[in-house]
């Protein structure tokens, strides 16, 4: 069987969730982020891209 390589995107949290609404805090948690400077490597899917777009002002794309 051939294994398919999945594309990934690596993001770093650069903004604080303090004083953000609950939806943005939940989106950060869904991306696996909760503290400044944390990094998370995620599958590059349309749903993850949408989550990144919702909180793009709090994130930095590393790769």
From Swiss-Prot:
GO terms for cellular component: large ribosomal subunit. Keywords: Ribonucleoprotein, Ribosomal protein. The keyword Ribonucleoprotein applies. One of its GO terms (biological process) is translation. Transmembrane segments: none annotated. GO terms for molecular function: structural constituent of ribosome. Part of the 50S ribosomal subunit. Belongs to the universal ribosomal protein uL30 family. This is Large ribosomal subunit protein uL30. It comes from Caulobacter sp. (strain K31).
